[in-house]
């Protein structure tokens, strides 16, 4: 109706209205390894070595919450029992041609996500670990705690995307940032709601935990096509 049935014009108008999707670095379009494991640096080095030994490409290594020391899955203290030399581990991954990204759950706080205290805390800690050699962050919707959005029309999940994107951009300067985020509209492969009309502008959209089954992959591909059609 809006463009006389011209799908290309409709998408062009939508992007003009809501903003373009940033282009990630070329390696983020490659092969990823992402599983929830309580593993050590040695375990992850073995993953990289096994990929190489068997002739399979590996471009991105995703490390879930067990890189951090806190039992509640928050905070930025390194789990020294799993990663006694985090700088060395990240440097070794780079030598193997692999980018590394950490999962991040926000902490419990009564402050607005835009308060100076919260912004300072997130900025200093996210950038501190980037300075160790981390390539990017996965801003993961925390099921226990959530950022507090001061705007009723902007969800905590979407606001977090904006905050993390700005913090990473501030650190990266003119370089591309590496940010993965939760898709607002999806929970573990199941569509729950309409997408945020601005969420697509911030990071690689992650649709949740899935199993390694053909039908699950089919559902993910279907979701990707369906939601892309409406601008997610």
Protein language model regions, located:
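Catalytic-domain carbohydrate-binding cleft regions of carbohydrate-active enzymes
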Residues: 1-232
């Amino acid at each position: 109706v809006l463009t006389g049935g011209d799908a290309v014009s409709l998408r062009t108008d939508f992007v003009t209205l809501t903003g373009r999707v940033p282009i990630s670095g070329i390696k983020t379009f490659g092969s990823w390894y992402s599983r929830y494991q309580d593993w050590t640096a040695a375990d992850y080095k073995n993953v990289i070595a096994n990929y190489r030994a068997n002739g399979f490409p590996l471009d991105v290594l995703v490390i879930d919450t067990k890189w951090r020391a806190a039992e509640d899955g928050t905070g930025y203290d390194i789990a020294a029992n799993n990663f006694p030399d985090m700088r060395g581990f990240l440097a070794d991954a780079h030598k193997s041609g692999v980018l590394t990204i950490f999962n991040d759950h926000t902490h419990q706080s009564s402050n607005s996500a835009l308060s100076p205290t919260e912004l300072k805390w997130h900025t200093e800690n996210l950038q501190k670990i980037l300075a160790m050699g981390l390539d990017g962050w996965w801003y993961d919707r925390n099921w226990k705690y959530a950022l507090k959005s001061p705007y009723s029309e902007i969800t905590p999940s979407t606001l977090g995307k904006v905050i993390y994107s700005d913090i990473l951009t501030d650190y990266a300067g003119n370089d591309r940032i590496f940010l993965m985020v939760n898709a607002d509209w999806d929970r573990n492969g199941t569509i729950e709601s309409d997408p945020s009309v601005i969420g697509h502008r911030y990071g690689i959209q992650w649709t949740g935990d899935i199993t390694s089954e053909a039908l699950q992959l089919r559902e993910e591909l279907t979701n990707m096509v369906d939601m892309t059609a409406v601008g997610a």
